[in-house]
């Protein structure tokens, strides 16, 4: 394994031992990626251990932050389907085709029987099925609902489908422990704003924003004062237009 990048970090022997221990637990590639991105941003040949440590910690914390919101959003849509359609009986054979017939009065059929969780009984309810299903299957069922009903979540149905698909895809980055900061393929701030938009209440949105503000203050003011160029490119700070987009 290539460890040459470790030589780019200004650190003591004790700090190096700590860093290698974290790398063993979390993965060298993740730390190496963050280290190289910091050097690229600052246009310097090395990075201080304290800076690498706090930015890596921020990346991990944001991963947990997104994961928490993902679970909340998923629960919101599962609860809606469960409360309104949870008692619908379905069988193992062509289960989703049956769901689509029942939810659309036979107007649309969608056969995805391969998604059926074999742990479920041959006959089950939609509520039990959704509990055992992935978010992908949850959205397949949700998008069968009439447009009028989906307007509860967003007046623009095409936008709702596009945004929830983005949120579903974001799970892959979070679940597989990929670096979120400095990632050109993953617009972290855009994704946080999008998830906040689907928090169910004003209070839940404000609570998450407060958590983000406290995290920024704790890491970048109290734990390690970052150079401005780094702080501006790393810290997620919401502005007026984003508050409006979230609905605040």
Where are these regions (language model features)?
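Histidine-centered active-site/metal-ligand motif
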Residues: 176
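Extended intrinsically disordered or low-complexity regions, especially N/C-terminal cytosolic tails and loops
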Residues: 1-162, 166, 181-248
């Amino acid at each position: 394994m290539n460890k040459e990048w470790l030589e780019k970090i200004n650190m003591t022997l004790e700090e190096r031992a700590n860093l290698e221990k974290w790398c063993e637990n979390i993965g060298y590639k993740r730390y190496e990626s963050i280290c190289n991105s910091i050097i690229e941003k600052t246009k310097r040949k090395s990075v201080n251990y304290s800076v690498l440590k706090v930015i890596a910690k921020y990346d991990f914390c944001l991963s947990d932050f997104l994961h928490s919101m993902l679970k909340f959003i998923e629960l919101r849509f599962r609860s809606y389907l469960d409360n309104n359609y949870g008692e619908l009986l379905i069988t193992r054979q062509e289960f989703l085709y049956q769901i689509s017939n029942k939810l659309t009065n036979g107007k649309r059929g969608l056969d995805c029987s391969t998604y059926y969780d074999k742990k479920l009984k041959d006959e089950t309810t939609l509520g039990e099925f959704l509990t055992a299903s992935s978010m992908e299957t949850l959205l397949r069922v949700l998008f069968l609902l009439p447009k009028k009903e989906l307007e509860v979540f967003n007046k623009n149905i095409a936008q709702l489908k596009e945004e929830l698909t983005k949120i579903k895809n974001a799970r892959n980055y979070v679940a597989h422990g990929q670096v979120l900061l400095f990632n050109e393929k993953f617009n972290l701030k855009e994704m946080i704003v999008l998830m906040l938009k689907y928090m169910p209440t004003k209070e839940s949105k404000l609570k998450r924003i407060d958590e983000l503000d406290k995290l920024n203050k704790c890491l970048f003011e109290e734990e390690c004062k970052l150079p401005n160029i780094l702080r501006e490119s790393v810290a997620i700070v919401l502005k007026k237009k984003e508050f409006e987009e979230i609905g605040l």
